[in-house]
Regions:
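Short coil/turn segments at secondary-structure boundaries
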Residues: 20-25, 55-59, 112-116, 153-156, ...
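Core residues of folded domains in eukaryotic genome-function proteins
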Residues: 2-9, 38-42, 84, 95-97, ...
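Beta-strand elements of modular eukaryotic interaction domains
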Residues: 31-35, 40, 86-91, 120-124, ...
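C-terminal single-pass membrane-anchor helix
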Residues: 388, 392-412
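Structured beta-strand-rich core segments of catalytic domains in phosphoester-bond hydrolases
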Residues: 49-159
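Conserved beta-strand elements of beta-rich interaction domains across eukaryotes
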Residues: 13-16, 48-51, 92-94, 104-108, ...
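Catalytic lobes of large eukaryotic enzymes
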Residues: 75-83, 161, 165-394
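N-terminal charged/capping segments associated with class I S-adenosyl-L-methionine
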Residues: 1-31, 119-121, 128, 385, ...
């Protein structure tokens, strides 16, 4: 079979609706110029998808944000090809979202979709977190008749000094991002189990063995994309650092060339020391940092004067790929980063010395932690969105009931 072509894009939306026209015009900027064919799968990882209250409440509160991103994909595709895509996955863990689209002729080969969510922000809530989707892709000549592709959207802890926290976030992903059951097929979009919990860390039943429920297992491709927040320095920049701020036109040997920053890149260091993202690889970085842009730069971008090509976000996957940033958009202080890659469809990938085992076992308490985080999210988000409070609502159950009632009639 021909390789499966993927286009994976990650973007921190800064809690704003995206500019559909501007985003669509540049959505495929990271695609190879000599490849006119549309990708088989498009994966969109978004962070700070919406204001925190809307993200925690989910449901209709997130519909405008996901709809605008879907419009971006549809418009970008229509500008290049006369073909349709099927939205297989639209899901989130708090403020982190994941969307998966399959080309219409490819969608029929996706036999099942499984999802998982985790929060590792404050008290394990979803202000920081990850959401994953696992697709079973039907193949010819493979022992099981399919291969699995796992996509994870993640937003890790910020700040230069928080390297250990980011490593702990990665460990949480391995231990508690648990896939449970097929919940959709290629013929329809994955929808949350119910509107009340769509923005939260959903609860449900478990099945199967742990070897296939975690993100690591044999005969599977794993891609992680997000605002991973690993920096190129262990300390925040000071005034004296302005002189060595990356220059696009600097010679590669010049200390001000962006490639010099990568010598102190935290993610590269932590991966080499087997402290984070065990067994993963990242395509070579050929673009300057994508964060953080000033308000003046965002205003310039709105007038078409912003930088045209800038890593705070990193799709992590196989080498031999096109890996680049998109222009700055006026709605965010981050720039989108995209990976265009083709993965081989092989009859079997035997477990050997190259197989990566899970660096940590699945947390046996993962479901209780997820359910607890769910309760922590919905009450404060209901307070922020509707003015609810414990003093007026009484018990937690009464608070939840009152928030649900208001959600049924409120229009965000």
């Amino acid at each position: 079979m021909n390789p499966l072509s993927l286009y994976i894009l990650t973007f921190n939306c800064a809690r704003n609706l995206v500019d559909v026209n501007r985003f669509a015009n540049h959505f495929f900027d990271a695609r190879p110029l000599n490849d006119p064919s549309p990708p088989d799968l498009i994966v969109l990882s978004v962070q700070e998808l919406a204001p925190i209250a809307y993200a925690f409440l989910g449901g209709s509160y997130l519909n405008p944000y996901f709809s605008s991103l879907k419009d971006v994909v549809n418009q970008a595709v229509a500008q290049r090809w006369d073909i349709d895509y099927v939205n297989l996955v639209t899901d989130n863990s708090g403020m982190t979202g994941l969307m998966v689209f399959a080309r219409s002729d490819v969608a029929e080969r996706v036999s099942s979709v499984d999802t998982a969510r985790i929060g590792f922000g404050f008290q394990e809530m979803g202000n920081k977190g990850a959401v994953g989707a696992r697709l079973a892709y039907a193949t010819e000549g493979t022992p099981d008749g399919s291969i699995d592709l796992t996509f994870v959207a993640a937003h890790l802890a910020p700040m230069e000094s928080a390297v250990e926290q980011r490593n702990d976030d990665w460990r949480s992903v391995v231990e508690r991002l648990v896939f449970e059951r097929p919940v959709a097929t290629a013929r329809g979009s994955l929808e949350p189990d119910d509107q009340e919990t769509s923005g939260l860390l959903h609860g449900s039943t478990s099945n199967g063995g742990d070897d296939r429920r975690g993100i690591f297992f044999s005969n599977s491709y794993l891609f992680i994309a997000g605002d991973l927040n690993y920096r190129t320095s262990n300390v925040s920049p000071g005034q004296e650092d302005l002189a060595r701020f990356p220059r696009l036109n600097a010679d590669p040997a010049d200390p001000r060339h962006y490639s010099q920053l990568l010598k102190d890149d935290q993610l590269t260091r932590e991966m080499r020391q087997s402290r984070s993202f065990h067994g993963m690889t990242e395509a070579p970085i050929g673009f300057p940092p994508t964060y953080k842009y000033t308000l003046a730069a965002q205003k310039a971008a709105a007038q078409g004067e912003g930088p045209r090509s800038g890593r705070g976000q990193a799709p992590v996957g196989p080498a031999g790929a096109t890996y680049d940033s998109l222009p700055l958009f006026p709605t965010s202080d981050h720039r989108a980063v995209a990976l265009s890659v083709a993965v081989p469809i092989v009859a079997s990938r035997p477990v050997d010395a190259t197989h990566v085992s899970a660096p940590f076992p699945i947390d046996p308490d993962w479901q209780r932690k997820r359910d607890t985080a769910r309760q922590r999210e919905i009450v404060p988000s209901g307070y922020w969105a509707h003015g609810s409070c414990f003093d007026r609502c009484g018990t937690l159950d009464e608070a939840l009931q009152r928030i649900r009632s208001r959600m049924e009639t409120a229009v965000p």
